[in-house]
Regions:
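Active-site diphosphate/adenylate-binding microenvironment
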Residues: 11-15, 21, 32, 37-38, ...
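Glycine-rich, acidic loop regions that bind phosphate or pyrophosphate groups
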Residues: 103-144, 166, 240-346
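Glycine-rich phosphate/diphosphate-binding loops that line cofactor/substrate pockets in enzymes
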Residues: 12-23, 63-69, 93, 151-156, ...
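Thiamine diphosphate
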Residues: 32-108, 111-112, 116-117, 262, 264, 269-282, 395-472, ...
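Glycine-rich, anion-gripping cofactor-binding loops and their flanking helix/strand elements
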Residues: 66, 212-301, 402-433, 446-450, ...
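Conformationally flexible catalytic loops at phosphate/diphosphate-handling active centers
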Residues: 147, 151-202, 337-339, 357
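Phosphate/pyrophosphate-binding active-site segments
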Residues: 1-6, 139, 175, 297-392, ...
């Protein structure tokens, strides 16, 4: 609070800047290095979620940034607190998510002595953060926090790391608050849109690819109207399926792990690709084999909010520096040609998508994850948020789930294991009224599974589906491909995850047959508690189309 002389502690100034910039929620693990900041929260209307490990806190904040487009906020202590949180910072970097991580720091007079838990955060985070800094002068807090919000959200969004020396936080200073930040849009030029229309009019086999961040529900709706007018097939890139309604007749599917071969052929055979928001990195490009580098055979129009990515890998015939939200609005001014030579192909693309995703494949064992994911389509509301971490289990999720609205998919492009559980909790804290479900592998879950305690503490009834095949499945798959039959370090002995849930005060159930899943799911919903459904799946079921035995035998045969 302001004293009679108009001063506030630096910590109060800091938290007041968060209020000014519209922050309603922060995630943290407490530490003595920033106690003054914690105290400042006491008198301000910002909700705090206390987590059990800093990686969980950072991932929750990242998930909120991903869902809202505004910076997720995380506070952690110095040293090991910061290094634990680095996983979330890396996710924010590769997923283009706005995130601001505040880190406690040793007192200024102790720096460069390797004081207790001292680190140079500019050096530690310099390669994964958009900007890493340390505040020495409390009078500059409004300036630097404002810059952090603009940096995290501007251009290609990403993480900012700010170190807070503990002695600086208790200094008193008279300084005005900064104005509230307003996200800066990057609009395409009139000449860009004119050239795009000419290229579309000249095309015979165009396709649209959507990815990246800086989208909104309004932008997705505008893009859908554009696709309608031009009868364009639209695909989404890795873990960005929520950008286009899968029920839309123009939807052609998603480019990720184990994609539809017909979709890959359609992209390769296109004569024009309109790539909006994404980078078409290693995963959606199928290890950079989908397009020729540096000059694709197809006419490439690349729309991205940041010139540093335009031309970095692919030389586009038309490169447009624009945010997806601004570009989608500008699309309203484009008119289709009188004749659309590709019109008959778009329904075929959608039919290929439906044929690939409607009916789950048969897999070894009594639990078919594909049938479970497909069965949830009719049981989940359209605004349900579906989260997942990394592992082969996610191939079933991405293939058979239906993400009907923008913001209903939270999954890491970075491929970070342990993402799903904290992301689900963050989403539930952000929107308690929405259904939130997370899928996690057995190895995946135990990287951040302690955050289930956070869900119980805050009465956040997320439903976690743990897919237990008793191994690090993705690594085992590659191990069998390269070193068939030589199993090392990929087997797991797991606990009873249903009992684990009950031990924390949640709901837990074991599922050993597909038919038992949906009664257990309904019971979990009715319990009103955070829940874990423990699926015991056959380790032979590596993916919807590949078995462990077949993978090994193919490798042994030299295939």
């Amino acid at each position: 609070m302001r004293a009679n002389d108009g001063t506030r502690t630096a910590a109060e100034v800091l938290i007041d800047q968060l209020v000014v910039h519209g922050v309603a929620h922060v995630f943290c693990v407490p530490g003595e290095s920033y106690l003054a900041a914690l105290d400042a929260f006491h008198d301000r209307d910002i909700a705090i979620t206390v987590c059990r490990q800093e990686s969980g806190a950072a991932i929750m904040a990242e998930a909120c940034g991903k869902a809202t487009g505004r910076p997720g906020i995380c506070f952690v202590t110095r040293g090991p607190g910061a290094t634990n949180a680095a996983a979330g910072v890396h996710i924010a970097r590769q997923d283009s998510t706005p995130l601001i991580l505040f880190v406690g720091q040793v007192a200024r007079e102790m720096r460069e002595r390797e004081a207790f838990q001292e680190l140079d955060y500019r050096a530690v985070f310099g390669s994964i953060a958009k900007w890493a800094t340390e505040i020495d002068d409390p009078a500059r807090i409004p300036e630097l926090i404002s810059r952090a919000f603009y940096t995290a959200t501007g251009g290609r969004p990403g993480p900012v790391v700010i170190a807070l020396p503990e002695d600086m936080l208790v200094e008193r200073v008279a300084v005005p608050d900064a104005p509230a930040f307003e996200p800066v849009e990057i609009w395409p030029g009139a000449s860009d849109m004119s050239r795009l229309q000419k290229l579309l009019w000249a095309a015979e086999r165009p396709i649209v690819l959507l990815g990246g961040s800086r989208w909104s529900a309004t932008a997705c709706a505008a893009l859908a109207r554009f696709a309608d007018r031009f009868a364009l097939p639209v695909a989404t890139t890795f873990r960005r399926a929520h950008l286009f309604d899968p029920a839309h007749p123009c939807y052609a599917g998603d480019l990720g792990i184990g994609p539809n071969p017909k979709l890959l052929a359609r992209v390769k055979g296109a004569d024009l690709i309109l790539l909006v928001g994404g980078r078409l990195g290693e995963m959606p490009s199928q290890s950079y084999t989908l397009l020729d580098i540096p000059r694709p055979r197809q006419t490439l129009v690349h729309v991205f909010p940041g010139v540093e990515e335009l031309g970095r890998v692919y030389h586009a015939q038309l490169a447009i520096n624009a945010t997806p939200t601004a570009f989608a609005a500008a699309l309203e001014g484009l008119q289709p040609p009188n004749e659309l030579s590709w019109r008959s192909e778009t329904p075929l693309a959608h039919a290929d998508f439906l044929a690939w995703t409607d009916k789950p494949t048969t897999v070894p064992g009594p639990v078919n994850l594909g049938e479970i994911v497909a069965g949830l389509r009719e049981r989940l509301p359209a605004d349900a948020v579906i989260c997942n971490g990394a592992g082969n289990f996610s191939i079933w999720v991405h293939r058979y789930a239906r993400y009907r609205r923008y913001g209903t998919q939270l999954a890491p492009i970075s491929g970070s294991m342990g993402y799903g559980v904290p992301a689900a909790i963050g989403a539930k804290r952000l929107a308690p009224e929405r259904t939130v479900i997370a899928f996690a592998g057995d190895g995946d879950f135990l990287m951040t599974g302690q955050e289930f305690a956070t869900a119980v503490q805050y009465e956040a009834p997320v439903i976690i589906v743990v897919v237990d095949n008793g191994m690090y499945g993705t690594i085992r798959m590659h191990q069998e491909r390269h070193y068939p039959g030589r199993v090392v370090a990929t087997g797991l002995k797991n606990p009873d995850f249903a009992a684990y849930a009950r031990a924390f005060g949640g709901y837990g159930a074991m599922v050993e047959k597909t038919a038992d899943f949906f009664p257990a799911f309904e019971a979990a919903q009715k319990s009103g508690k955070p829940a874990i459904l423990h699926l015991k799946v056959d380790p032979e079921a590596l993916t919807p189309t590949i078995s462990l035995k077949a993978t090994r035998e193919k490798a042994q045969a030299g295939g």
